[in-house]
A protein has these predicted regions:
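Alpha4 helix (beta4-alpha4-beta5 surface) of REC/receiver domains from two-component response regulators
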Residues: 62, 75, 82-100, 107, ...
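Acidic phosphotransfer microenvironment of two-component signaling modules
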Residues: 11, 32-36, 107
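Two-component/phosphorelay signaling modules centered on CheY-like receiver
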Residues: 11-29, 116
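Active-site residues of response regulator receiver
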Residues: 52, 80
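Acidic catalytic/metal-coordinating carboxylates
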Residues: 33-36, 59-63
Length: 119
């Protein structure tokens, strides 16, 4: 299966999503903000970056820009609970697979990850 980096500042949600993806057979790693996520991306190769948009230190938009520039083959899937953040992600359309709206049900995020990995 895939090696996935879950970057989310809400620890309960981050652990919940990572655990669900592990149950699907994926190898997951977790980061609490964009800067930590970028460090982890530099240290290891991942198949998918699943990141919240609104985070401290470095937000998911900046993380996605830098990740796409440094790791061209990386698939990027963003998550947000804020409509205005989704609009901010529009300029990333060529660099990301999709934006998943929070709150989401577990089948929704699993489906989004499967679709992202299939592309």
């Amino acid at each position: 299966m895939a090696k996935i980096l879950v970057t989310e500042d809400e620890s309960a949600l981050r652990m919940f999503v990572a655990r669900a993806l592990r149950l699907d057979g994926h190898e997951t790693h977790e980061a609490g903000d964009g800067a930590e996520g970028l460090e982890m991306l530099s240290a290891s190769q991942f198949d998918l970056l699943l990141s919240d948009i609104r985070m401290p230190v470095m937000d998911g938009i900046e993380l996605a820009h830098q990740a796409a520039e440094r790791h061209p083959g990386l698939k990027i899937l963003l998550m947000t609970g804020y409509a205005e953040q989704r609009e901010r992600a529009d300029d990333l359309a060529s660099k990301i697979v999709d934006v998943v709206q929070k709150p989401f049900a577990l089948p929704d995020i699993r489906r989004a990850v499967a679709q992202a990995l299939a592309q």
